[in-house]
């Protein structure tokens, strides 16, 4: 419990990051339709987010090693706010692709920093429980972000301003936390192949989940809209798509912790 209390600020930052980034994808799809973008253009805008996400995974460790965790987080969260605000200033599919690359970098970077901050507090006894709570907050933020779609009018300044505010709010809890950041490593190398070497099953599971989730989160709102659903119904469609995952996180974490304890008991 003490460890969870020490992570409240970080979890609050996670919540605000997800409130902003989780609503941007569906809003872009609906706004693209309102601005007469083609389905291909809307798909490319959604794909650009994940391209930016991959870029963010590579550049964030470099930024951390240069300026530290807090400054890197603030910079990347600000980048997310700027990219959201610029959408209606540049209402063109080409520029939206560029902006979604920037927002993807922002999301990847902010999550990387938060998870680096959390990792030193984990051990084999509490890892499953804390990870479950972390994912519950993360997916609950996604859930609320999908519900926000019912309140955000597509292709309007106010809708994108609200998303930018969420990005800015994510900076406050982490900036004010009393939890000390991890030590800054002198050299960081990102080697994705090591994930497959350590746990092939987990790596392939994440790959499959990423393929399915990215399609749903990018094009789900567009599909629902073209099916004749109202904006409020589109939001419900997206909410129920995320709800099952949100409800499963804490039980999965507890099962992982119990399974590890039993495994260790049998080994001894």
What are these regions (language model features)?
Residues 261-268:
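Conserved small/polar residues in nucleotide/adenosyl-binding loops
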């Amino acid at each position: 419990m003490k460890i969870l209390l020490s992570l409240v600020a970080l979890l609050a930052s996670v919540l605000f990051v997800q409130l902003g980034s989780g609503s941007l994808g569906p809003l872009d799809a609906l706004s693209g339709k309102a601005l007469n973008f083609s389905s291909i253009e809307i798909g490319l805008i959604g794909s650009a987010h994940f391209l930016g996400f991959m870029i963010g995974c590579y550049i964030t460790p470099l930024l951390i090693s240069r300026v530290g965790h807090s400054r890197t987080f603030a910079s990347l969260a600000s980048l997310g706010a700027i990219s959201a605000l610029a959408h209606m200033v540049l209402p063109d599919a080409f520029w939206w692709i560029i902006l979604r690359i920037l927002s993807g970098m922002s999301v990847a970077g902010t999550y990387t920093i938060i998870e680096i901050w959390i990792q030193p507090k984990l051990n084999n006894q509490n890892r499953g429980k804390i990870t479950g709570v972390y994912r519950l907050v993360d997916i609950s933020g996604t859930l609320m972000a999908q519900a926000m779609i019912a309140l955000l009018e597509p292709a309007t300044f106010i809708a994108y301003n609200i998303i930018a505010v969420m990005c800015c709010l994510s900076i406050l809890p982490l900036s004010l936390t009393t939890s000390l950041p991890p030590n800054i490593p002198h050299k960081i190398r990102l080697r994705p192949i090591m994930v497959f070497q350590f746990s092939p099953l987990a790596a392939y599971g994440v790959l499959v989940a990423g393929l399915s989730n990215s399609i749903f989160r990018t094009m789900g709102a567009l599909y629902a809209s073209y099916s004749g659903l109202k904006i409020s119904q589109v939001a419900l469609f997206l909410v129920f798509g995320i709800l099952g995952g949100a409800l499963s996180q804490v039980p999965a974490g507890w099962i992982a912790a119990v399974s590890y304890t039993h495994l260790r008991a049998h080994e001894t």
